[in-house]
């Protein structure tokens, strides 16, 4: 009975809901291990302890749409100074997922229209490209690129090339 309780409690931690944090030089190969952004039942999901944000001045990225999320560690907060940028606590993770609409799963549609919510992001009609993480460590910010292949994205520090037929 005790073994069953141990196994069940171990499984509970691996269910996506709240995200994980990894120290420098200990980053996982798969994005899903962070629990920040993942695919579930053909839908893109984010962690319960993260929130979606948008920029008031969007940046152009070859017509790619972007899902931006921010995760600040529990019981922590960001600070603001009029003369400086925001101060984020160690453990903060900023993510930006680049994707295109792809009605047929092959070619992509160039559009800048998306309402910024997860409600209409059917993965079968998207072409996920990359998720970039900015991770706040004790020594500063570290950038990690994860390239999407199938149902997950994989750490690829050197980047990647993708052919995208356009309709």
Question: Each predicted region: which residue ranges?
Answer:
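Bacterial N-terminal signal peptides
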Residues: 1-9
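Sequence context surrounding c-type heme c attachment/ligation sites in exported
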Residues: 11-18, 22, 109-167
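Internal, charge-rich low-complexity segments
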Residues: 102-110
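N-terminal pre-domain segments of enzymes
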Residues: 12-72
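Sequence context of c-type cytochrome heme-c attachment sites
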Residues: 58, 69, 74-78, 94-95, ...
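Short, well-ordered loop/turn sites that connect or cap secondary structure elements
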Residues: 88-91
């Amino acid at each position: 009975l005790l073994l069953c309780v141990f196994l069940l409690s171990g499984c509970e931690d691996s269910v996506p809901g709240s995200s994980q944090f990894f120290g420098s030089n200990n980053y996982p190969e798969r994005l899903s291990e962070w629990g920040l952004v993942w695919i579930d039942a053909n839908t893109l999901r984010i962690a319960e302890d993260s929130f979606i944000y948008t920029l008031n001045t969007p940046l152009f990225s070859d017509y790619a749409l972007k899902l931006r999320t921010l995760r600040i560690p529990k019981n922590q907060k960001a600070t603001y100074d009029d003369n400086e940028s925001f101060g984020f606590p160690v453990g903060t993770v900023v993510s930006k997922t680049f994707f295109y609409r792809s009605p047929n799963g092959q070619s992509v549609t160039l559009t800048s229209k998306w309402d910024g919510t997860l409600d209409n992001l059917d993965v079968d009609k998207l072409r996920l490209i990359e998720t970039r993480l900015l991770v706040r460590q004790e020594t500063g910010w570290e950038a990690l690129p994860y390239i999407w292949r199938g149902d997950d994205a994989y750490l690829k520090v050197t980047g990647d090339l993708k052919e995208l037929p356009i309709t």
